[in-house]
Design a protein with these regions (language model features):
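Active-site catalytic motif of lipid deacylating hydrolases and related acyltransferases
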Residues: 29-93, 130, 166-216
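Serine-dependent carboxylesterase/thioesterase catalytic core
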Residues: 76-166
Length: 216
């Protein structure tokens, strides 16, 4: 085989390989849109949302400070990320999970976006914006939290038609009159939850309060 012929064969092989890569690209993109897109928001001091384990697809990054400005930052970043993913994968279900201050971020996002976003569910773990009944409002719903201002201040259930699960277990953050009180908080009650995202379904709706499930 002459040098010219060898060069021609190599060029043809390179073109063929390139065409195969191009042809295979849509399949790879489709695979990335399979299943559920799980996005998580960590609590106070966990700006990288590292507390969660399991099949996490995206961790929201924000300042995670105890202020409404920080919560608004988290809501805006969550909104950007989840909408970017929806644009890339229009038919993919999204699951938003937040813990503590991150639960407030997820709570507010649902309240502000339920009318314009579907095929999504939310899991709120120790949500300070949890509205009482059973139990009492979370810390954000107490009168002294008014100094925080919007959007952190207040407690509600404005979830529209988005399936939302709230989980609160003897924890003053989500039930300000929890029996364990602040001593319980200091001894670990606030962390007595599962942070494996695979433990939470894609369609749960209602609340787990002190280990008992109740519908909204």
């Amino acid at each position: 085989m002459t040098r010219l012929t060898r060069t021609g064969v190599a060029a043809i092989a390179l073109v063929a390989a390139t065409m195969c890569s191009i042809a295979g690209a849509p399949h790879v993109a489709a695979a990335a849109c399979d299943g559920t897109y799980t996005i998580v928001v960590g609590g106070f001091g966990d700006g990288a949302s590292t507390i969660f384990s399991g099949g996490v697809d995206q961790r929201v990054g924000y300042s995670a400070q105890l202020s409404s400005a920080s919560v608004r930052e988290g809501v805006n970043e969550l909104n950007r990320l989840v909408r970017d993913q929806r644009q890339a994968c229009p038919s993919q279900h999204a699951k938003v999970i937040g813990y503590s201050e991150g639960a407030a971020v997820a709570h507010i996002w649902v309240s502000e976006n339920w009318a314009t976003f579907d095929d999504v569910n939310a899991v709120l773990i120790s949500d300070p914006k949890r509205q009482g009944g059973p139990g009492t409002d979370g810390l954000a719903g107490q009168f002294y939290a008014a100094v925080m201002g919007a959007p952190l201040y207040g407690a509600d259930r404005n979830f529209g038609d988005i399936p939302t699960v709230s989980i609160c277990t003897d924890d003053v953050i989500c039930d300000s009159a929890a029996p364990s009180g602040w001593i319980g908080y200091l001894t670990g009650a606030h962390g007595n939850y599962s942070f494996d995202v695979d433990d939470y379904s894609d369609d749960g709706d209602g609340q787990w309060f002190n280990g008992v499930f109740m519908p909204w």
